[in-house]
C-alpha cells in the first residue's frame, strides 16, 4: 500500500505544469487531492482528469493564500500534505516596478508563510505533516534577467529551510523542489534567458513528480530533478567568485543575443 493512500493533499497552482503532475501522482498513489488554481476552468479540468483515471480530486479555485480553509472543508478534515506550488515568474532587473517586486514576494514567499501559519498548529498537535515547496534552481543559484523571481525564490527556499530545522523533530517533513528548466508555460515566460540557460536541459513535469516521490521516500529536503544542480550549488558555495564570474559570462552572452 502506498504511503499516501487515503491522505488528504492540497496542490496549489495545479491547473497545469508541475502542479498538475503532482496532483495526478498523489491521486495515483491513493490520496484525495485538492486541485487549486487561479483559473477555475483549469482546476476543474485537472480534477476531472484525475476522476476519469479512477482517482479522487476536487477543484478549489482561487488565490493560493486562501486555499487552506476551503480545502479543509472540501476534504472533510485535516490536510496531510500541502504542496506550495503556485509561483510567479517575474522577469526584470533592479529597476522592475515596485508592483512587480511586491507581487513576486506575495506569491513566491508570503503565500507559503500564510499556509504554514494555518497548517502548523494541527500538524504540531498530532505530530505529523508534510510541506512541499516548489522553489526552483533559481532559489539555490540565480536566474539571469529575472531579479524579482530569483530573489523571492531564495526567500522561498530560506523559509522551507527554516520550517525544516525548526519542526522536523516534531514530525513535520519539508521538501524543497529545485528544478531547472521544466516544459511548462513558465519556461516560455522566461523568454530568451530561458532559451539560453534552461531550454537545452528542460524536462517534463512528470519527471519533477518522480523526483519528489523518490526524495520523499528517502527523506530528503532538497529535491533536485536535475542532478547537475547539486554540482552548481557546491561550486557556488566553495568558490563564489568563480561562480559569479561564470554567471556574468552567461549574462554577457544573453545581452549579446
Regions found by a protein language model. Name each.
Residues 47, 51, 58-77:
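Conserved amphipathic alpha-helix within the SDR
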Residues 8, 15-16:
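Conserved glycine-rich cofactor-binding loop
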Residues 29, 141, 162-173:
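Active-site-adjacent segment of SDR/Rossmann-fold oxidoreductases
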Residues 176, 192-232:
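C-terminal helical subdomain
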Residues 136:
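Residue(s) in the substrate-gating loop at a strand-loop-helix junction
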Residues 116, 152:
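Active-site helix of classical SDR
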Residues 87-102, 125, 145-148:
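Conserved mid-core segment of classical short-chain dehydrogenase/reductases
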Amino acid at each position: 500500500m502506498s504511503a499516501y493512500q487515503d491522505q488528504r493533499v492540497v496542490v496549489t497552482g495545479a491547473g497545469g505544469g508541475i502542479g498538475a503532475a503532482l496532483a495526478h501522482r498523489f491521486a495515483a498513489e491513493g490520496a484525495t487531492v485538492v486541485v487549486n488554481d487561479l483559473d477555475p476552468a483549469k482546476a476543474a479540468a485537472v480534477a476531472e482528469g484525475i476522476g476519469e483515471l479512477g482517482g479522487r480530486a476536487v477543484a478549489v479555485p482561487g488565490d493560493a493564500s486562501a486555499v487552506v480553509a476551503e480545502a479543509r472543508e472540501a476534504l472533510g478534515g485535516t490536510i496531510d500534505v500541502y504542496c506550495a506550488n503556485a509561483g510567479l515568474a517575474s522577469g526584470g532587473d533592479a529597476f522592475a516596478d515596485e508592483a512587480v517586486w511586491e507581487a513576486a514576494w506575495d506569491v513566491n514567499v508570503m503565500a507559503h508563510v500564510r499556509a504554514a501559519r494555518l497548517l502548523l498548529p494541527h500538524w504540531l498537535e498530532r505530530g505529523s505533516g508534510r510541506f512541499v515547496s516548489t522553489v526552483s534552481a533559481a532559489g539555490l543559484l540565480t536566474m539571469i534577467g529575472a531579479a524579482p523571481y530569483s530573489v523571492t525564490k531564495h526567500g522561498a527556499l530560506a523559509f522551507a529551510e527554516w520550517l525544516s530545522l525548526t519542526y522536523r523533530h516534531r514530525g513535520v517533513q519539508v521538501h524543497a523542489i529545485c528544478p531547472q528548466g521544466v516544459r511548462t508555460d513558465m519556461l516560455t515566460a522566461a523568454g530568451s534567458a530561458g532559451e539560453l540557460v534552461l531550454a537545452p536541459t528542460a524536462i517534463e513535469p512528470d519527471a519533477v513528480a518522480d523526483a519528489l516521490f523518490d526524495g520523499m521516500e528517502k527523506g530528503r529536503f532538497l529535491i533536485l530533478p536535475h542532478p547537475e544542480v547539486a554540482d552548481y550549488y557546491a561550486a557556488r558555495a566553495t568558490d563564489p567568485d568563480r561562480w559569479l564570474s561564470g554567471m556574468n559570462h552567461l549574462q554577457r552572452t544573453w545581452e549579446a543575443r
